[in-house]
C-alpha cells in the first residue's frame, strides 16, 4: 500500500514518532518506516483485515492502521478484523492534530 503523502512527510520530519494523544487512545508509537511493510506481513493484516495497513501501535495490544477510505483506525492485534476497527481520524492530518505538543 502507498502511504499517504502527509504521513510520509511526517515520518521524514523531526516531529515525535511516539508520545501522547489528546484523546483515545492516548498513546502512539509509529513503527520505523523501513519496518512498516514487514510488520504488516508479520501480523497478516491482508488476511485478517483486508484493506487496512498498519503503521503504529499503542504499546498495549492495539495497532493503528490506514483504512480503505484513508482514515486512521485502531485495530486489536488479537481478534483483528475490519468490523472491530475503531475510527480515530478521517486522515493522517487529523490524527496528527491530536498529538500533544510540549514546550
Segments predicted by a language model, with ranges:
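Short catalytic/ligand-binding loop motif for oxyanion handling, primarily in non-cytosolic enzymes
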Residues: 62-65, 82-84
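Short acidic-glycine loop/turn motifs at beta-strand connectors
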Residues: 67-70
